[in-house]
């Protein structure tokens, strides 16, 4: 049972990772640093202006030293809690008169949407001196109204020695009570930072809780206007050029009018096979409407042909060394055939894996007798029929090889699954 749970958990983690990767690679996430970090908590943005990356937004784990300088990979923490003021209980406030009964007095919280943080408080309960009863009193946490904010609050109090999800508890005079508030941000705030007051009902004590929703990048607040890196035709924002309306390209180097377009997005679309395809098939960079492929072996108008993707033969060579790889398909030299150019047409027979049938050992030469000319019986197969039978035999062998390969893969998968179950 534990093995099955482990296997299911593993599959769930893999699926979640793939989903996050898709969100980070989406069109919206590539538009800006802010859009990137909002796409998913695992997304990060390369703010290195000299990076050659086509997609600046990626899973944080995908960045390498070669693709982006490590300290220039921007990935804010999903939750940050910072205590701003923390005077101890029973000390005097700055006015020299008021006794501190709630600690801390000011806390700032930064949260990404769909994430939460827990803030801990202590409260010193003191009854009215005129009250003579020694019976426990009810303390109740109160806060500002959060109805019109994207916040969701949960309250916990250490009550009777146990942490309970509640807003109230019966306490004794001079008892120090610990309580916690869990803050969840459901979405970005349209009004900026949110200020909450946290106190105890009917008590003269209060603390400030300041919540900031992380829905953008700090670097977006400090653009480099008319940057030289953008040919002075745009602003450098978080390592990426935001071009003037008349310019396009990674570095604003392309005048749109010269390329027959009016928008930068139209110029980029010239590097797509269709509207849903990635720029340059994700194998190159778009330079003023033309693809420049990342590797010499990648070709095509949209870098759609990978000339390293042809099958390897048993001899370890692409196209068996008897042809060239053209856009993922072997184009065989004269005298060779099959998908991997492994079969010689001269032998008229080729076994599996492209290995020619062994030639017969040399026999002593003998002069064959001249056969007598005889008429061919009507039921004897013609040469074309024999060739047809050979082709059918070859096809049958290929089907048999393919079937055995499938069975082999199924067996491997079953063996792996059984090993996991026994783990």
UniProtKB/Swiss-Prot annotation:
Domain of life: Eukaryota
Stretches in topological domain Extracellular: 17-402
GO biological process: integrin-mediated signaling pathway
Residues covered by region (Disordered): 354-406
Domain I-EGF: 219-253, 254-304, 305-342
Annotated transmembrane regions: 403-421
Main location: membrane
SUPFAM superfamilies (UniProt xref): Integrin domains, Plexin repeat
Entry keywords, A to Z: Disulfide bond, EGF-like domain, Glycoprotein, Integrin, Membrane, Repeat, Signal, Transmembrane, Transmembrane helix
One GO location term (cellular component): plasma membrane
One matching Pfam family: I-EGF_1
Membrane protein topology class: Single-pass type I membrane protein
Ranges of Acidic residues composition bias in the record: 380-392
Cytoplasmic topological domain residue ranges: 422-423
Entry similarity comment: Belongs to the integrin beta chain family.
PANTHER family given in the database record: INTEGRIN BETA SUBUNIT, INTEGRIN BETA-PS
Name used for this protein in its record: Uncharacterized integrin beta-like protein C05D9.3
